[in-house]
Amino acid sequence: VESEELGPPDGPPRRVRLLGENLVAFRDSGGQVGLLDQRCPHRGASLFFGRNEEGGLRCVYHGWKFDSEGRCLETPTEPSETFARGVRARAYRCVERNGVVWAYLGPAAAEAPPLPDLGWAVAAPENRSTLTYLRACNWLQALEGDVDTAHLGWLHARMDETGRRRLPARADDPHRDKVAQDLSPVLSVVDHSAGVTIAARRNDDDGRHYWRISQFLMPIFTSVPATGRLRRAKAWVPLDDEHTLVWERNWDPSEALSVEQRRGRAGRVPGSGMHDDGDEPLSRGRFVASRDNDYRIDRERQRTASFSGLEESAPVQDAAVQESMGPIVDRSREHLGASDEAIIRVRRRLLEAARALRDGGVEPPGIRSPESYRLRGCQLVLPPGADWQEASREEQRA
């Protein structure tokens, strides 16, 4: 959650779902954020209905009270004053950084790793915007859309009057149409200390090469090229095996964003309708266009104006195809090709890290090197034979 969602001390708690657990977040009287199991340890009533007061969250069922670390402070229904000492709510450590609440769900006795130095995580509030939306599928199949550059010229393309696919160029993105014209990009995929860099080479009109560079950062972060001075990154937060909350951050490293650029702070995706947010985690950030109405596909628009026929909103278009795979796609039925090299490499990197942790207790790559996350997506045009890694070194820095 964002810090502002929890409000001032002793404000109302908020439901949170994370890694399949139902939790409740609150800010105590001293301003410390607590993240507890939603179930009261007494009889399982939801602490969401609790009273946040005087240094803890009090269950309204029998008045038991817990602090931000899960310690039971009071059990007023019990005659023994020492009874509370043997009761504890499951609690997870939280850290606030620049308007975002981060939680550590690892072993309670372990040392939490430092927070990654993601560009958006350190940008000033006035320099960034936030979009949040739900993806009703597994987090990895959703994330893979950001490392799959080949789909851009198909799914997101428009149709001109001749029936040709187009992604019209803009003043702040003059090479945008190249992804719709060169549909077979040449990929160069490179591992780095915190993930994978994906560079897609397409032919430009004048014989040069247009390079579109994206980043995968372990385990749930991506960054793709944005327009103009803006930078863009996402966090694909697993609510459970079949639901993902996408945090999209756009930021300018040095200047405040305009009102138009920051309109996403309310959690709305430009160009698409969204239901009013409820407090239930699986109702937050739901598109009006969904599986229930076939994502409002318009077959006439598909024939004349839009390759997909879906709304002119990339997140909605991505949701339609990714959710259509099912909650967890059966990857044993896939037929991967050369254009899927980045998908293959990201999966391999995740599997290698998971096995190393399981078999030898080896921490995932980059976890103790927060500076290795200072990478972002970018784009540039180079002459044939130019070294894209050297030419983009500065551009890739977040």
Q: PLM features: residue spans?
A:
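Rieske [2Fe-2S] iron-sulfur-binding domain
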Residues: 2-129, 175, 186, 195-197, ...
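C-terminal catalytic domain of Rieske-type non-heme iron oxygenases
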Residues: 8, 32, 108-398
